[in-house]
């Protein structure tokens, strides 16, 4: 039984590997290894700047406010669940 031409062409196309497009630059791993020493500009950028000292990070206070907010949310949810159960039982 003879196969139609389009089936044989389809099979050969499926068997042959597709050419892959080059990877995008932002998806490639960095070329710079971790063992390479930092340059002078990078070292200068990483140094502590005294002019920026007054704009200190408020990271710890933000964490504390977040924890308090999470606790209050839990208390409100517990109170709502308690009210629902109390109304269902009465």
Swiss-Prot record:
GO biological process, any: tricarboxylic acid cycle
Organelle targeting peptide span: 1-41
Membrane topology: Peripheral membrane protein
Pathway listed: Carbohydrate metabolism; tricarboxylic acid cycle
Family annotation (InterPro entries): SDH7 (IPR034573)
Keywords of the record: Membrane, Mitochondrion, Mitochondrion inner membrane, Transit peptide, Tricarboxylic acid cycle
Cellular compartment(s): Mitochondrion inner membrane
PANTHER family named among the record's database cross-references: SUCCINATE DEHYDROGENASE SUBUNIT 7A, MITOCHONDRIAL-RELATED
Protein's name according to its UniProt entry: Succinate dehydrogenase subunit 7, mitochondrial
Organism the protein comes from: Oryza sativa subsp. japonica
Lineage of the species this protein comes from: Eukaryota, Viridiplantae, Streptophyta, Embryophyta, Tracheophyta
Gene name, Swiss-Prot/TrEMBL: SDH7
């Amino acid at each position: 039984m003879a196969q139609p031409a389009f089936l044989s062409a389809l099979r050969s196309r499926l068997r042959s590997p597709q050419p892959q497009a080059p990877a995008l630059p932002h998806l490639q791993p960095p070329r710079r290894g971790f063992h390479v020493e930092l340059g002078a500009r990078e070292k200068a950028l990483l140094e502590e700047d005294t002019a920026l000292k007054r704009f200190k990070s408020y990271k710890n206070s933000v964490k504390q406010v977040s924890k308090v907010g999470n606790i209050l949310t839990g208390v409100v949810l517990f109170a709502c669940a308690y009210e629902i159960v109390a109304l269902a039982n009465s």
